Amino acid sequence: MIRTGAFQVAAFWLAALATAAPAAPLTRDLGDGLTYVRIRDLPADLPGGAAVPGQTLILDFRYLVAGRDAAATLLAWVEFRANARSPLFLLANRETGADLNAVLRRVSRGKGCVVIGVPGPGFEPQLAAKSEPAAEREAYSALERGEPVMSLLTENPGKARLDEASLNHPPAEEEDAPAADAVKPAPPIDAALQRAFHLHRSLRALRRL
């Protein structure tokens, strides 16, 4: 018979392994072979395996600070993974760590990589997006809160549609409608992510992917 103490030891190690296991990265499928991956733990969150022809990855390094060793791992991974038929769109901003930004500047000179973001002190992307820092942060956080990714790419996604039915709706009923039924304000547009999305769709339209 196995002693109770053995069960306790086994339970302890199982709990320790569960605690040590990294959380799965936040990913979203944007369609047409485009996948978004938010990098919060480097290098653990980097996708594994070789590139798939026709697949494009958006890797989001915004607000991530990583050490020199992690940045060096990213450099090796990008050099192995990036190519013109399976490009990498790398999102960064002024708050991305200095070691990571140094790597991004280096890989941007190669083929198959495009660095995209809102310019700021010490950060000049290849493809610039326009956004205020507070709006960018709010849009970035909205995805963590569970907002649909497409709502961060489309202007006024929550705007009520004005059609014949709404025009014929009795005014009295409109006045009696509870405030809770009001249209939910749309989250801010994620300008950098939107820029990457539009670039991908343009390349697809030109049959370059």
What are these regions (language model features)?
Residues 1-4:
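N-terminal secretory signal peptides that target proteins for export/translocation
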Residues 22-209:
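C-terminal "post-core" interaction segments
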Residues 8-18:
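Bacterial N-terminal signal peptides
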